[in-house]
Amino acid sequence: MTKSAKTPAAVVLGEVDLPEGQLLILDPGLGRFWRHDAEPASPRKKDPAAHDLRIVGPDAEAAGRAYDREFDPRHLFDRTDPQDAVKHFGRFAKEQGFDARAEVLSSRVPHAERARLAVEHGKGLGVVKYNGLWAVVADGLPRDRGLQVIGVPMPRGEFAGRWRSIDVVVDGKAEAVRSEQVSGVMVDHGQLLFAGLGPMGRFRMWESLDGLADYVFFGKDAPALAKELGASDLGKGVFGWKDLPVAQVGEKATPLQERIGKDSLAVGVDYRPHCNLERLNAQLRESEEDAGSLVLDGARAVGCGNRWGDGIFPVSRHFDAKGRTVRLRVELGTEERQQLLRRIQLRQRAAIVTRAILDDGEPIRFAERMKPHSAQDSGWAFSSGVEDDTYMKKASNLVVVSLRSLLARCKELDAILDAPVGSVFRREGEGFVPE
């Protein structure tokens, strides 16, 4: 089939090897929280101790599903209030008529085991909790060959340059006739990593693999500061020191940070130990596709930017007519995600407000959305009703401000801001109604 000019071709981001036939999808920037087969404690020392609970009894699974706290209804993971959790579940089960109870486990369930439990419960696709975060795991995939990871672009237009989805292709020629979906993979650093479940046990974040690290800085005041401190120009506006022994990083970092703080310099810093995450990020910084690869325990893994930022993204599994898995898909540019981004972008734009509101403290009583004059203009104009025609004709009585600043003063506006051009509202009680 000939592709439409409005449908850019898919982009191959790399290949992932799955020696056990199990795929794990998570945000690599959260990789230090994945403890694999180790004690699943948080790496942050300030975090309280957590416990895992198992739901038992004749109605255990039905009660767990109704309680709806975990993808795997047989457990409650990462609870810092275990006895309270036992009591809360007990009350729920009693009220709902379930013969089930929660027990605190004497030892915690490692993340790799949780992943296996998740795919068991989800019959091949599941959500696994790790230190309160979510990853997605899939089972029953080919072990004897690499699988392509591809970026499927959005059509040209409003969201051009973003991915509609990122797919792991099992059979690129087969036709998918049905799908199932879980929600989802939690992203906090705008990235995704596709790795074999077993190989993920070798992923290291903030732990240098060779005992070395880079310490870099950037920003408006960085060039002058680099000359002062004898730092190298590393290109693309970045300065600093490469391949420092980890133990010696402080010798460079301390005077640099003291200097930045003393004079409030416009400089950002980044500590980059030679770990798996930094090896991936170094590739992403140079990649036109914002993608890179790692080798973990001899198996290839693929990392990439998701081009939509942070959030929880659904993952779907697609089957052919014979019930075989033909691809897995991280759903990125969904209609819901597009609407969310439009809302965020709109609230970063400007609006017109009268000085009666801005300076004199009058409340917003009237709102009208006109056709925007630029990409930075929301089209919204707000008045209090005390202004007459003469007042409104005087340009100095009108001020351009950000919608965000108005929302801080009048939270009720948020409910009407997505209304189309031509909408007019007036205040009534604690909210706004169409005029």
Which residues does each predicted region cover?
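Extended, low-hydrophobicity segments enriched in charged/polar residues
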Residues: 3-283
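Acidic, proline/glycine-rich low-complexity IDRs
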Residues: 1-5, 224-435
